[in-house]
Amino acid sequence: NQSSSSGIAFVKRIWRRKRFARIAIAKMLMTAARTAPKARGTDNLVLAVATDDTIVEIAEKMKQLAVERNMDFLNRDAENILNCGAVVLFGMKISPLGLNCGACGFATCGEKPKNVPCFFNANDLGIAIGSAASLAADLRVDSRVMFSVGQAVLALNMMPECSMVLALPLAVKGKSIFFDRK
């Protein structure tokens, strides 16, 4: 009947708007990360947003890694992201800044093995995700920084140029899904 089909159309319009809203919020958080201070003004940050089927793919990989690595908390985190509208991914390329500071444990950037992260790259990643998490809180969107999601993203080679990936899952529920985790 006419009213039933118009009701379904209304629900579909609302869902599309919710999808638009979660993508818009994710993009705002990515902007906060992109504009966060970085050592020497060098931007080695790689940003992406996962939704829908990509979240499912990441969660499945997390569950697989939970078994392979004997890390049960990966299952809990996988369930968390399955209840999120979007997951913002923050990756960092290893790119020494040539400061020869020794903060990575090696006397010079030249002595540092290629696969060892530059201290400043890791620090920049933390500052960027902190800026994004702060904005999420300002917007009253629940979030939690998760390295576990990043491990699955790396294992799936979703951000091949990155050596480090962290994630900020986003949820808008009546109660934070990240609060009473067991």
Language model features: what each stretch is:
Residues 1-182:
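Acidic, surface-exposed loops and disordered segments
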